[in-house]
C-alpha cells in the first residue's frame, strides 16, 4: 500500500468516527497542509461543509452552527497562523460550553523547529481553552492504526459534547504528497454506541431541599442559554413555588411566549433601586449570572444579609461569581427541576404580589414612554423584538443591543442567541450567519451596533457565498455607545471620543453593496416594522440602518428610570435611583 492509500484510509477512518459521534457539519479554512482532510470531508455526503477563507470568521461561523443545531461542528485549517486565528472563537466556545471539534494540520515532526516554512509549535496551542488535546500519530494503514484513527474521531466529537461541553483540539502531522485517493471507499465498519449519564440527586436530597424552601419567600435566577423545553421547566418551577423568576434574555424565558406572571421581565429597571417591602429568604441560582448589572448588585447586597443562597452547578465547575452560595447543587438542571416539580409547594401569595405590582408599574411606564418616542436605538431594538415570529431566530450583539432588550422587552415567543461567554464584540456577524445556516428558510435577524459590524465585516462574505437570508438591523451611533452609560462619560471630550467614543464615520451602504446585501436607512418606527414584517415572510440578505445619538439613548434611559421612581414612590415603596 502506497503513501496516498495509507493516508486516505487512515483519515477516512477518523471521519467515520466523527460521524458516529454526531458530527453533521464542518467548516473548512482552505490551505495546503489540510488538503487531504478537506477533500475527504468535502466528499463525505453525511457531512455538510462550508468554506471560509477567513479563519477567524470561520471559527465563529462554526460556533453559530453548533449553538443553533446543538451538535458538534468540525473546524479544519492548515498549519501556521491559520490555527491562531481560531483562538477567539475557541475561547468563547469554552466559556459558553459549545462543542467544537478543532482539527489543525501540521508539518511532520522532521520539519518542526528546523526553519521549515509555515511551521510553528501547534502542540497544546489552545492551552486550557479546550478540554482535550490529541497529537495524532502519522498515518498508518494497519488494522490497529485504523482503529486508532476511528477511535480518536469518535472520542473527540463525543468528548466535546459531554458535560461540560467545550471545544477539543486534534493536531494532524501530515507528510507530502497531500492529495488523497478519492476513489477509495471507507474500510471502517466500526460503530460505537455512547450511553452518557448525568448528575442527579437522590429523592431524599430533593425532598430535603424542598423542605428547606417550604413557605419561604424565594427567587429563581436563571442565566445562560436555554432551549424552549428547558425554559418551560423553569417557568413551571417558578409557578409551582409562586416565586418570581429573573432570567438572562438568552435563557429564552422572556421570549418563551408562555406569558406567565411569575416571569419578571423588567427587574433590571427596579432592582437595587427600589426597596422591596419584603426581601427574599431564599435565592436559587441556575448557571451564570444574568447580564443585568442591577440584578448582580442586588444579589451582592442580599449576600450580606440572612438570605440563603443555593447554586445549581450543572457543569461541576463552581462558576459562582458571587462566591456566596451556602449550598452548591451539582445536578443536571432539567432533571433537578423535574424532580422538584413533584415535591415543592407554593409560598404565600403576598410575596409574589409585590413583584407583580412593580412589574406592572414598569410596564405601564415603558408602554407610555416608548410609544411616544420616535425612532432611536431603543425603540428600534423593541421593533425588532415585536416583529419576531414564533419560529424566528434573533442573534443579539454584545454591548448595548442586548441591554436594550434585557431592559425593555416583554414576553414574545421566538429563540434568541448571543455570545455571552466572554462577551466580546468580535465574530458576531459570523456567529449569526452560522445560526441562520441551520434554518435558512426561517426568519433570521441580527441586531448589532456599528463597531461590532465593522469588527466582523469579513463574515458577510458567508451570506453572499451561501445565500443566507440574514436581516441585519444596524444600530449606528458612530462609536461605542456603551461608554456613554459608564464612568468614562465624565471625561473631557478630547479624551473620551478618541479612546472610548471611537467614531468610525463609515458609509455602511457601501459595505452592503460590497457583499451583495440590499440596504435601507429607516427614519421611522413604522417604516422599520414594515420592512421587518416583510422580511419575516420573505427572508433576504439585507442591512437596515438606524442612525442614533449616544446621548439621546442615555437621556431616554434616565427619564424612564425617573418616571418609574415617581410612580413607585406614590405606591409607598422607597426609591433610591
From Swiss-Prot:
One protein family per Pfam: TPP_enzyme_C
Free-text remark on how the cofactor is bound: Binds 1 thiamine pyrophosphate per subunit.
GO biological process, one term: menaquinone biosynthetic process
Pathway given in the UniProt record: Quinol/quinone metabolism; 1,4-dihydroxy-2-naphthoate biosynthesis; 1,4-dihydroxy-2-naphthoate from chorismate: step 2/7; Quinol/quinone metabolism; menaquinone biosynthesis
GO terms assigned for molecular function: 2-succinyl-5-enolpyruvyl-6-hydroxy-3-cyclohexene-1-carboxylic-acid synthase activity; magnesium ion binding; manganese ion binding; thiamine pyrophosphate binding
Top-level taxon of the source organism: Bacteria
Keywords from the UniProt entry: Magnesium, Manganese, Menaquinone biosynthesis, Metal-binding, Thiamine pyrophosphate, Transferase
Enzyme class: transferase
InterPro entries assigned: DHS-like_NAD/FAD-binding_dom (IPR029035), MenaQ_synth_MenD (IPR004433), MenD_middle (IPR032264), THDP-binding (IPR029061), Thiamin_PyroP_enz_TPP-bd_dom (IPR012001), TPP_enzyme_TPP-bd (IPR011766)
E.C. number(s) listed in UniProt: 2.2.1.9
Cofactor: Mg(2+); Mn(2+); thiamine diphosphate
Catalyzed reactions: isochorismate + 2-oxoglutarate + H(+) = 5-enolpyruvoyl-6-hydroxy-2-succinyl-cyclohex-3-ene-1-carboxylate + CO2
Membership in a protein family: Belongs to the TPP enzyme family. MenD subfamily.
Subunit note: Homodimer.
Function per UniProt: Catalyzes the thiamine diphosphate-dependent decarboxylation of 2-oxoglutarate and the subsequent addition of the resulting succinic semialdehyde-thiamine pyrophosphate anion to isochorismate to yield 2-succinyl-5-enolpyruvyl-6-hydroxy-3-cyclohexene-1-carboxylate (SEPHCHC).
Name the record gives this protein: 2-succinyl-5-enolpyruvyl-6-hydroxy-3-cyclohexene-1-carboxylate synthase
Amino acid at each position: 500500500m502506497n503513501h496516498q492509500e495509507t493516508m486516505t484510509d487512515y483519515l477516512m477512518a477518523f471521519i467515520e468516527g466523527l460521524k458516529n459521534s454526531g458530527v453533521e457539519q464542518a467548516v473548512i479554512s482552505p490551505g495546503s497542509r489540510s488538503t487531504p482532510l478537506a477533500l475527504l470531508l468535502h466528499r463525505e455526503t453525511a457531512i455538510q461543509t462550508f468554506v471560509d477563507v477567513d479563519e477567524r470568521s470561520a471559527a465563529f461561523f462554526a460556533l453559530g452552527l453548533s449553538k443553533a443545531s446543538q451538535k458538534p461542528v468540525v473546524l479544519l485549517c492548515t498549519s501556521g497562523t491559520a490555527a491562531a486565528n481560531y483562538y477567539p472563537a475557541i475561547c468563547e466556545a469554552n466559556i459558553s460550553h459549545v462543542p467544537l471539534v478543532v482539527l489543525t494540520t501540521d508539518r511532520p515532526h522532521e520539519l518542526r523547529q528546523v526553519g521549515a516554512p509555515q511551521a510553528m509549535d501547534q502542540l497544546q496551542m489552545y492551552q486550557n481553552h479546550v478540554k482535550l488535546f490529541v497529537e495524532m500519530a502519522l498515518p498508518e494503514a494497519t488494522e490497529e492504526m485504523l482503529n486508532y484513527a476511528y477511535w480518536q474521531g469518535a472520542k473527540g466529537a463525543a468528548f466535546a459534547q459531554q458535560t461540560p461541553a467545550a471545544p477539543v483540539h486534534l493536531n494532524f502531522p501530515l507528510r507530502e504528497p497531500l492529495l488523497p485517493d478519492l476513489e477509495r471507499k471507507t474500510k471502517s465498519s466500526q460503530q460505537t454506541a455512547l450511553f452518557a449519564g448525568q448528575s442527579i440527586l437522590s429523592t431524599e436530597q430533593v425532598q430535603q431541599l424542598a423542605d428547606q424552601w417550604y413557605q419561604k419567600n424565594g427567587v429563581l435566577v436563571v442565566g445562560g442559554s436555554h432551549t424552549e423545553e428547558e425554559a418551560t421547566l423553569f417557568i413551571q418551577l417558578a409557578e409551582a413555588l409562586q416565586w418570581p423568576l429573573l432570567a438572562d434574555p438568552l435563557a429564552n424565558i422572556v421570549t418563551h411566549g408562555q406569558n406567565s406572571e411569575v416571569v419578571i421581565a423588567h427587574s433590571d429597571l427596579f432592582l437595587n433601586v427600589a426597596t422591596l417591602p419584603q426581601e427574599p429568604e431564599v435565592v436559587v441560582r441556575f448557571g451564570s449570572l444574568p447580564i443585568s448589572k442591577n440584578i448582580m448588585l442586588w444579589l451582592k447586597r442580599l449576600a450580606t444579609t440572612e438570605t440563603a443562597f443555593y447554586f445549581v452547578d450543572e457543569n461541576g465547575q463552581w462558576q459562582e461569581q458571587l462566591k456566596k452560595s451556602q449550598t452548591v447543587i451539582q445536578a443536571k438542571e432539567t432533571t433537578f427541576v423535574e424532580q422538584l416539580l413533584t415535591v415543592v409547594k407554593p409560598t404565600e401569595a403576598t410575596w409574589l404580589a409585590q413583584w407583580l405590582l412593580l412589574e406592572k408599574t414598569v410596564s405601564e411606564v415603558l408602554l407610555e414612554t416608548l410609544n411616544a418616542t420616535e425612532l432611536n436605538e431603543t425603540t428600534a431594538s423593541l421593533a425588532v423584538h415585536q416583529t419576531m415570529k414564533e419560529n424566528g431566530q434573533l442573534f443579539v450583539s454584545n454591548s448595548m443591543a442586548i441591554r436594550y432588550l434585557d431592559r425593555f422587552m416583554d414576553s414574545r415567543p421566538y429563540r434568541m442567541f448571543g455570545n455571552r461567554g466572554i462577551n466580546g464584540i468580535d465574530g458576531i456577524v459570523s456567529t449569526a450567519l452560522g445560526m441562520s445556516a441551520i434554518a435558512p428558510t426561517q426568519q433570521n435577524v441580527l441586531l448589532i451596533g456599528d463597531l461590532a459590524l465593522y469588527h466582523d465585516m469579513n463574515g458577510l462574505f458567508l451570506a453572499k457565498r451561501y445565500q443566507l437570508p440574514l436581516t441585519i438591523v444596524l444600530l449606528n451611533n458612530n462609536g461605542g455607545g456603551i461608554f456613554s452609560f459608564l464612568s468614562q462619560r465624565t471625561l473631557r471630550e478630547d479624551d473620551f471620543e478618541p479612546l472610548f467614543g471611537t467614531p468610525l464615520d463609515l458609509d455602511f451602504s457601501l459595505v452592503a453593496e460590497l457583499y451583495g446585501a440590499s440596504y435601507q436607512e429607516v427614519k421611522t418606527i413604522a417604516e422599520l416594522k414594515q420592512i421587518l414584517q416583510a422580511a419575516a415572510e420573505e427572508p433576504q440578505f439585507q442591512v437596515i440602518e438606524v442612525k442614533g445619538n449616544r446621548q439621546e439613548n442615555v437621556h431616554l434611559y434616565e427619564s424612564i428610570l425617573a418616571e418609574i421612581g415617581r410612580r413607585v414612590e406614590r405606591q409607598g415603596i422607597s426609591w433610591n435611583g
